[in-house]
């Protein structure tokens, strides 16, 4: 699963965010060299804020392409029909969705941002890949990142409050992550 995340982060052409940097730097150099030499980029479906995911299409051989999709958990789950669980591919049914939600909610309550990774093997073809190809994916797993607030955040918020300025939070993060961060910096998450 981490290799799939690395391929996605390595081969995307957009700006790499802190999560991509963490994935790239968290992979040992030997594995990174091996992945880069074995897999070639074929195409890319760029990130956009509507889909909240992005995909790269890579090939290890001339017969098959692999679409590697990475993004916000719910948006990835929406395009998955199966999940890799204990080394086997099983249907992504309600029971499995509840298990995933239980685990990821626990991670979010700890302030960890969760990014999901899914894949799909396709016969090799010519031409561009489209958003429609991001369907019937296999959820490979998810990676969790801690992105703590800067040490200066809480004092800055106190100073704003003392000056009579009300601070509102607008975030694309999970509600649970936002609540944890608000608690850490002394804001009411309500």
Predicted region positions:
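The conserved cystathionine-beta-synthase
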Residues: 149-159
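Glycine-rich, often acidic-flanked micro-motifs
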Residues: 163
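Cytosolic catalytic regions of ATP/NTP-dependent phosphoryl-transfer enzymes
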Residues: 1-139, 145, 158-159, 167-187
């Amino acid at each position: 699963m981490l290799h799939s995340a690395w391929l996605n982060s390595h081969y995307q052409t957009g700006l790499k965010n802190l999560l991509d940097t963490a994935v790239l730097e968290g992979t040992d150099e030997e594995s990174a060299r091996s992945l880069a030499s074995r897999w070639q980029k074929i195409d890319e479906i760029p990130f956009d804020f509507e889909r909240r995911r992005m995909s790269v299409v890579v090939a290890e051989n001339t017969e098959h392409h692999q679409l590697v999709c990475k993004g916000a958990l719910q948006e990835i789950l929406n395009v998955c029909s199966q999940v890799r669980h204990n080394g086997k591919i099983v249907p992504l049914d309600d029971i499995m969705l509840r298990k995933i939600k239980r685990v990821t909610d626990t991670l979010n309550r700890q302030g960890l941002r969760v990014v999901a990774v899914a894949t799909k093997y396709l016969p090799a073809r010519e031409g561009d890949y489209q958003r429609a190809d991001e369907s019937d994916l296999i959820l490979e797993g998810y990676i969790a990142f801690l992105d703590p607030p800067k040490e200066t955040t809480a004092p800055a918020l106190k100073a704003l409050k003392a000056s009579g300025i009300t601070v509102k939070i607008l975030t694309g993060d999970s509600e649970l992550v936002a609540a944890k961060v608000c608690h850490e910096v002394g804001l009411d998450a309500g």
